[in-house]
Each structure stands twice: as C-alpha cells, then as structure tokens.
Amino acid sequence: MIRRYLRELRICEYYKNCAGGITKLLFKLHNHYRNKIGLQLGFEIPLNVFGKGLHIFHTGNIIVNENSSVGEYCTIVGTTCLGSKNGGNGPTIGNHCELGMNSVVIGNVRIGDNVYIGAGAVVTKSFEQNEISLVGVPAKVVAHKN
C-alpha cells in the first residue's frame, strides 16, 4: 500500500508540473486516488517536497508542511512530522537522511546531508553538518559518521 501511495505521489507531481489540458484531468484523477490512499495510511505529504528516492518503511501519521524541502533518497520510518512555526517556512533537509520513528523537525531549520534523526528526536534548530546523528529532546549531536 505504501508503494502505491509513493507511485501516485510521483505521478501527481509529474502531472502537476506539466502544462496542458489532459494533464489537469489526469492530475485530478490521480490526486483523488493519492489522497484516498493517504487517508488510509495516515500520510499527509504535499507535492514537490521530496527529492527522488523517498522510502517509507511503516504506516502511521506522516505530516509534512508544504513549505518543507527534503533532498534525494530520504528514508522515513513512520510517525514523523516536518512542520513550521506559526505558518512560516518548514525545514530544509539534505540528501540521504533518515528520520526515525516519532521524529519531529519543526521550524525554519536546515539539516545537512547523510544525517540520521533518531527515534523520538525533536529538532528545533539547524544542524548543517554532514554525516551526524541527532537524538533527544531537543535534538543534540551524538555521533559523527566516518
């Protein structure tokens, strides 16, 4: 079911970014189906937020702010929130990042490449270093990958 949702997400992004008469109709059709699957899975993921290679391991509430930006090959392990403070910009997350179960990234923060955000971590400030692990509330760097 997750694969179907991701497939529909990418199809909707394609039709949304294309200009033309029939693509609007196809977009509406696929977007309706994507939203239907998203309700069953608990996903609220706007279009054109994630780069290629998004991988989701588990169902559960995944809420993403439409002003967020996530790089390529991101992995989400379920029940994750990428949000904003008071309607502002959402987080910007680099390539090859992994978001653990129940992780939260809130506000206009920047996260580097190859970052692991641990289960239950709450990130409220920027960590632009690459290849680090973040855990805790509020999140702190606990390891540098080599």
Give each language-model segment a name.
Residues 8-11, 68-76, 113-117, 121:
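Conserved long hydrophobic alpha-helices within structured protein cores
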Residues 7, 55-56, 98, 116:
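N-terminal alpha-helical segment
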Residues 78, 85-87, 91-146:
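Glycine-rich hexapeptide-repeat left-handed beta-helix
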Residues 28-73, 80-87, 103:
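Left-handed beta-helix
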